[in-house]
Amino acid sequence: MSDNDELQQIAHLRREYTKGGLRRRDLPADPLTLFERWLSQACEAKLADPTAMVVATVDENGQPYQRIVLLKHYDEKGMVFYTNLGSRKAHQIESNPRVSLLFPWHTLERQVMVTGKAERLSTLEVVKYFHSRPRDSQIGAWVSKQSSRISARGILESKFLELKQKFQQGEVPLPSFWGGFRVSMEQIEFWQGGEHRLHDRFLYQRENDAWKIDRLAP
């Protein structure tokens, strides 16, 4: 098969979205209510990693970057994730806190996109979550200088074993370079696939202490 033939096959990959629509009359006033419902349904459907979300940031040149992290908490203040503070995403957030989140629940023919500003979590919040993690995950946080170049995986594995020995007694201390961010919710868009590509999209936009809801064309 030629590269062109393979490209033509990709171009024709498509399917109809038939799992149901989203109507204005069914929308709650608070988008968190709908988000919680959809997340619960994603969990009930046993999707792989239902809390996985794409975090998009931009560097000082305006170049976008994306990566998948796990949502660890959400409430009216925002959506929370944890990371190495020396990572590329953390540095980019420090210089430009505007980020976008995307929950790609493909199996349910749904997406949720959140845009807002990211801010660092308090040390108290970080410590509480860090010590709730499995012990090996706590040690793993010490191992990697995230986004730095390394010559082989063996370097990480050797470092892990070294630190596991070092921290075998007592609590694993919180690394100074490990923390988290809370992304405020300025806009939340809910997307539900529809037949004939007539998808349903609703945008919640914060206006003072309330939410304005608009239907968007697909």
Curated annotation (Swiss-Prot):
It catalyses: pyridoxamine 5'-phosphate + O2 + H2O = pyridoxal 5'-phosphate + H2O2 + NH4(+); pyridoxine 5'-phosphate + O2 = pyridoxal 5'-phosphate + H2O2. GO terms for molecular function: FMN binding; pyridoxamine phosphate oxidase activity. FMN binds at residues 67-72, 82-83, 88-89, 111, 146-147, 191, 201. Its EC number is 1.4.3.5. GO terms for biological process: pyridoxine biosynthetic process. Substrate binds at residues 14-17, 72, 129, 133, 137, 197-199. Pathway: Cofactor metabolism; pyridoxal 5'-phosphate salvage; pyridoxal 5'-phosphate from pyridoxamine 5'-phosphate: step 1/1; Cofactor metabolism; pyridoxal 5'-phosphate salvage; pyridoxal 5'-phosphate from pyridoxine 5'-phosphate: step 1/1. Binds 1 FMN per subunit. Pfam families: PNP_phzG_C (PF10590), PNPOx_N (PF01243). Homodimer. NCBIfam families: pdxH, PRK05679.1. PANTHER family: PYRIDOXINE-5'-PHOSPHATE OXIDASE (PTHR10851:SF0), PYRIDOXINE-5-PHOSPHATE OXIDASE (PTHR10851). Belongs to the pyridoxamine 5'-phosphate oxidase family. Catalyzes the oxidation of either pyridoxine 5'-phosphate (PNP) or pyridoxamine 5'-phosphate (PMP) into pyridoxal 5'-phosphate (PLP). This is Pyridoxine/pyridoxamine 5'-phosphate oxidase. It comes from Escherichia fergusonii (strain ATCC 35469 / DSM 13698 / CCUG 18766 / IAM 14443 / JCM 21226 / LMG 7866 / NBRC 102419 / NCTC 12128 / CDC 0568-73). The gene is pdxH.
